[in-house]
Amino acid sequence: MFQGADLPSGWHLNTCLVNFYGAKLEGGKRIDTARVGEHKDFEPGPVASLSLGERALFQFVTSSRPGERDEVVEQQWLDDGSLQIFGGDQWKKRTFHRVQRVDTKGGHTFDIHVAGFETRRINFTFRYVPDEHVVPFAKLSKQAQQDGRGYVEELAKHSKFFAAALKAAP
């Protein structure tokens, strides 16, 4: 779903966004939150997406005015182990994409300890962020460091990289 010309100079997959899909557990009830609304990824070049667990209905849609139904341009089920790669103007600039829903039929759950959450699907999205936009934790503004510190501290418990990033920060 992309051409060689869609690869910017210096392109390489240097970041990974990990999304957990499943249900919030509140008062003994499961509230399904396994979806992502329509959006565009603005990083240059193709995006590679690896899906694990329950299958998800992935759609490309046209933008519309609020209150109107979106037109589905392309859709596909992303099964356990699926690798999807997309890029180019058609899929990154002219259309939005979304995860419309995640099945429960396979009975997949992950033994991941996130308080109040049951994970049925994990998605790893790899993309290229130009080097000039990658900022070390120590060089973030004081406010940005404060906002992200708790998360980085949690990551540092199991990662030498994040432990070093915390140590280097003022």
PLM ranges: what are they?
Residues 12-95:
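Catalytic core of non-heme Fe(II) oxygenases with the double-stranded beta-helix
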Residues 7:
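Core nucleotidyl-transferase/polymerase catalytic module
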Residues 61-170:
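Catalytic core of Fe(II)/2-oxoglutarate
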Residues 4, 25-26, 112:
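Nucleic-acid-interacting cores, centered on viral/eukaryotic replication and modification enzymes
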